[in-house]
Structure formats: structure tokens, C-alpha cells
Swiss-Prot record:
This is UPF0173 metal-dependent hydrolase BT9727_4343. GO terms for molecular function: hydrolase activity. Keywords: Hydrolase. It comes from Bacillus thuringiensis subsp. konkukian (strain 97-27). SMART domains: Lactamase_B (SM00849). Belongs to the UPF0173 family. It holds the Pfam family Lactamase_B_2. InterPro entries: Metallo-B-lactamas, RibonucZ/Hydroxyglut_hydro, UPF0173, UPF0173_UPF0282_UlaG_hydrolase.
């Protein structure tokens, strides 16, 4: 399993001959190295409905005939836009041709905001995402606060790499993320969701220096690790 980071919360997984993107916020993302028009993808996994996570999903899914795996309400909302979706919910898992996906809890919001009409559409509960393929497991926490059931996520899953938000303000900050890393018991922890906007500026290297009993890895946009 090859895993690459592409700024903000964008993670690409290459496994079993398939390409999977998590939270593909590309257009308007100052920290990504990817251009939507150049991306080839087989499946898109979404943690929640905010614009900086749904991003280019509709365009990418239509262009590549990719399936979008998302919480039920968000999947339904996107299906109305002509996207091929697979709805799931927290606690549920499903075997796809690239591997197994399971949704976990995340403490955040989830909505689609229409600035022009000044409306907010509820898109279900936010989620974290577990992907297991080639006997390796990745945990993408989505946008979330620290919560004690992260201990359970760590106990139930042998996590090889965890992507944890550290930006603060909208998610947990670095101090809480250090505790989250301890609880999820991942072998490797990669910080995400930081420095995209001024309000979430953080030093990822200071964060990884504080980690214990795991390997902290700062990935620049386009860099990857192989599990």
C-alpha cells in the first residue's frame, strides 16, 4: 500500500491496482500539489460535507466514473448531482475491490454551505475512515476533536498509519493530537489539516517531536510512504 499526502486533509492510497482519494479538496487549496484535471481515481472517500473536504468530488467522480463512499446523508446529497455513491454510516464496514472501509466516530460538523443563496444543508454525521488493504490499515481521522473512544479505535484496529488533524480552532490542536496518537496506537502518525489558512497555522515538526511510542512523519505535498 502506497500512501501519499497532498495538503490539508487530502490523502491518496494506491493499492491492489486501484487509486483512492480521501477528502479531495484540490481547487482552491493553496497547499496541494494536485490539479483536479490531472487526477485519475477509482474511489473517493469522504469524511464529511464541508467544502474543504468534499472539494472536487463531483468533478472527479464524473470524469473517472469513480464511486464516492460517504456517510448516508452526504452520499444521498451527492447522488442527486449525478454521482455514483456508496452510502455508509458510523460503525459500518464494507469490502470493496481495493480493500475494506469502515467509518468511525468523529466530533465535528457536516454541512453543505450555499453562499449564494445563504443556505446550509445538513449532510449527516462526520466520520473518521479506516482503510484496510494488503494486510495494512490506515486511519484518517477526518476533522475531529479529541474524544475518549479513540482508545477503542486503537484497541480494535492494528493501525499502521494515522493521519490526525492538528490545526486547532476547527479541530483538535497539537496537544490534543499528541494524546490522540497515543490512544489510537498507530505505528506511524502523520499530521494533517494545518497551515492551509492563517487560523490553522501550526508547526508540524514541533508536533511530531512530542510523539511517543510511534514514528512521527511530516509529509510535504506529494510525498509518500509505503506500508
Amino acid at each position: 500500500m502506497k500512501v501519499s499526502y497532498h495538503g490539508h486533509s487530502v490523502v491518496k492510497i494506491e493499492t491492489n491496482g486501484k487509486v483512492i482519494l480521501i477528502d479531495p479538496f484540490l481547487t482552491g487549496n493553496p497547499k496541494t500539489d494536485l490539479k483536479a484535471e490531472d487526477v485519475k481515481v477509482d474511489a473517493i472517500l469522504l469524511s464529511h460535507g464541508h467544502g474543504d473536504h468534499v472539494g472536487d468530488t463531483v468533478e472527479l467522480a464524473k470524469k473517472n466514473n469513480a464511486v464516492v463512499v460517504a456517510p448516508f446523508e452526504l452520499a444521498t446529497f451527492l447522488s442527486w448531482q449525478g454521482v455514483n455513491t456508496h452510502p455508509m454510516h458510523i460503525g459500518g464496514s464494507h469490502e470493496f475491490d481495493f480493500g475494506k472501509v469502515k467509518f468511525t466516530q468523529a466530533f465535528h460538523g457536516s454541512s453543505y454551505i450555499d453562499e449564494e443563496n445563504k443556505t446550509i444543508t445538513y449532510t449527516g454525521m462526520p466520520a473518521g475512515i479506516l482503510v484496510t488493504a494488503e494486510e495494512k490499515t490506515l486511519y484518517h481521522a477526518g476533522d475531529t476533536a479529541l474524544f475518549s473512544d479513540m482508545k477503542l479505535i486503537g484497541e480494535l484496529n492494528n493501525i499502521d498509519v494515522a493521519f490526525l488533524p492538528i490545526g486547532d480552532n476547527f479541530t483538535m490542536g497539537p496537544e490534543d493530537a499528541v494524546l490522540a496518537a497515543k490512544w489510537v496506537q498507530a505505528k506511524t502518525v502523520v499530521p494533517m489539516h494545518y497551515n492551509t489558512f492563517p487560523v490553522i497555522e501550526q508547526d508540524p515538526y514541533q508536533f511530531v517531536e512530542k510523539l511517543q511510542n510511534c514514528t512521527g512523519k511530516v509529509l510535504e505535498a506529494g510525498e509518500s510512504i509505503t506500508l
